[in-house]
Amino acid sequence: MVGVTLANVLPVCLALLPPPAAGLYYLAELIEEYTVATSRIIKYMIWFSTAVLIGLYVFERFPTYMIGVGLFTNLVYFGLLQTFPFIMLTSPNFILSCGLVVVNHYLAFQFFAEEYYPFSEVLAYFTFCLWIIPFAFFVSLSAGENVLPSTMQPGDDVVSNYFTKGKRGKRLGILVVFSFIKEAILPSRQKIY
């Protein structure tokens, strides 16, 4: 009998971890570079998710409360999209969207525990109605930090931000996490003369 040990599992985990991390890093770079196109793509994803939810209600008779919460969540996502790529983590829309993601998951788990559907259909529901839009917003959290100043808010210029908010050189978000991981795993060598 062959036992599964940490020595067997660890190399597999280490081999499977870098490709998704590299893909997410590249995706974060693309989102930072093309914020207008990303906003448009997220808007189409929200419309697609809304159409899927309406179709599930009309053709599959999914519960009204589950579809209603999903549609309200998409409405909140449209509110987040109004200030994209500048997403404030303390804004009511962002906090409400995080809470609604949890509520949507609870309702979906409760529904699929009572009703049998094949795994592929359950996975499709979770992917297109619950995961894809929050994932898109999550990956694009760092996109607002590298956009040039605009006229979105009066008095929000570079000089007043520097003096009122302190250091603006700090970068936050998923891109910083991936940059740290990249430097920790594959440190760059500097030539010393």
UniProtKB/Swiss-Prot annotation:
The keyword Repeat does not apply. One of its GO terms (molecular function) is COPII receptor activity. GO terms for cellular component: COPII-coated ER to Golgi transport vesicle; endoplasmic reticulum membrane; Golgi membrane. Keywords: Membrane, Transmembrane, Transmembrane helix. Its main location: membrane. Belongs to the SVP26 family. This is Protein TEX261.
